[in-house]
Regions:
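Bacterial N-terminal signal peptides that target proteins for export
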Residues: 1-10
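Compositionally biased, intrinsically disordered/low-complexity regions enriched for serine, proline
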Residues: 3, 18-19, 32, 44
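Bacterial N-terminal signal peptides
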Residues: 10-19
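Sec/Tat signal peptide C-region and signal peptidase I cleavage site
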Residues: 21-24
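GH16 jelly-roll
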Residues: 26-233
Length: 233
């Protein structure tokens, strides 16, 4: 991953939700240029003119606590999600050089608290403003899945700051809604508008020309400078 200058916090999570967000007007078709599932040939190389300032290739036996915090939260804390976020190893672990975030069905009770999952972030460890953020992921599929890779303001109150959401800001690098489309991911920006009311910009939707995002690994990228934010898949 490439990031420059402190300010933002990276968050990586997988959610099990049934909500469907607003539609996006700007859709881009994605055609694979190389086999994204080939681990040996897909090592990310910093582009010319960029310096690598932080990365995690998940080569250790366990999730590195110096890089990631396992955020513990009750079910329904953020989006009415049915799972609670735990610090259990079974919900987030390393397997064959990959970080696996797993939702586990733990109860036949309908609704809240029938799943556990993980919510990993870099709060209090690493934060960046401007730069390039890159992750290579293979997504789940099906109704109820909502994996996401996004950034929140380092000052957000859920991580010990003094600023509530959406005043803290949010940049969604990748969100996937299994209830809507297994071949599409979306990017978005959330912020506080007049009277601190939640506002958002439906910035981008990426759709595969063939197959699903669950079929193989894909590279999700966001570049942020003083003038614009650019997403790519």
């Amino acid at each position: 991953m490439l990031k420059l200058n402190p300010f933002r916090t990276i968050l990586l999570t997988i959610l099990c939700l049934s909500a469907i967000p607003p539609g996006f007007a700007d859709e881009q078709k994605v055609k694979l240029e190389y086999p994204a599932s080939n681990l040996e040939s897909d090592d990310y190389l910093a582009p010319a003119g960029w310096n690598l300032v932080w990365s995690d290739e998940f080569t250790a036996d366990v999730v590195d606590p110096d890089n990631w915090t396992r955020q513990v939260e009750p079910a329904g804390r953020f989006n009415g999600e049915w799972q609670r976020y735990t610090d259990n190893v079974e919900n987030a672990y390393i397997d064959n050089g990959c970080l696996v975030i797993k939702a586990i069905h733990t109860s036949d009770h309908h609704g809240m608290n029938q799943y556990t999952s993980a919510r990993l972030n870099t709060a209090g460890k690493f934060a960046w403003k401007h730069g390039k953020v890159v992750a290579r992921m293979q997504l789940p599929y099906g109704a109820g899945t909502w994996p996401a890779f996004w950034m929140l303001g380092a000052n957000i109150d859920e991580n010990g700051g003094d600023t509530p959401w959406p005043q803290s800001g949010e940049i969604d690098i990748m969100e996937f809604y299994g209830a809507k489309d297994n071949a599409a991911v979306e990017a978005n920006i959330h912020f506080a508008g007049a009277n601190n009311q939640h506002q958002h910009m439906g910035a981008k939707k990426f759709r595969l020309e063939e197959g699903w995002f669950a079929d193989a690994f894909h590279v999700f990228e966001m570049e942020w400078n003083e003038e614009m934010i650019t997403w790519s898949v």
